[in-house]
Amino acid sequence: NIYLFYGDSKLLEDCYENIKRYVDYVDRNSPQYLSDWGRGDWVPVKTLSSKELTSSVYYYVDTNILAHAAKLFGKQDDYEKYTALAENIKEAINKKYLNRDTGIYAGGSQTELSVPLMWGVVPEDMKAKVAANLANKVQKDGCHVDVGVLGCKALLNALSENGYADLAFQ
């Protein structure tokens, strides 16, 4: 985020090898491109969400950050490797968790809909449907937040960035 906000790549460059080791570790332990390593949506209000889904989305996010950093630092081989890995992770998530007929991820919790939407996992042709499902879920829940730590960051952003800022404000 420091690089994105200030354009200063020093911290990202200093951490590059550590990020790479971390992504490689998760990759070694995720042969099907899906991970359940992590806490999941810790401390949810009431509804539990798939730990594998949320962990895999963050595995995708971390891999994507690494790929973009590799490009920034002129590490072409790493850029190609981690870009391909990120796409494989995204494809595996959507294959296992996205019901293309309904536009629902996993069980359809606020977290399970907002996390893939906010982090760019949802296929372009499905964004509107997934966002509408998220909005409907929030309304069905009385405009109350029903997420844990991971969903908390994603929920309002996913709504706001997909045409439901008024609902996010409520």
Predicted feature locations:
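Active-site core of glycosidic bond-cleaving carbohydrate-active enzymes
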Residues: N1-Q170
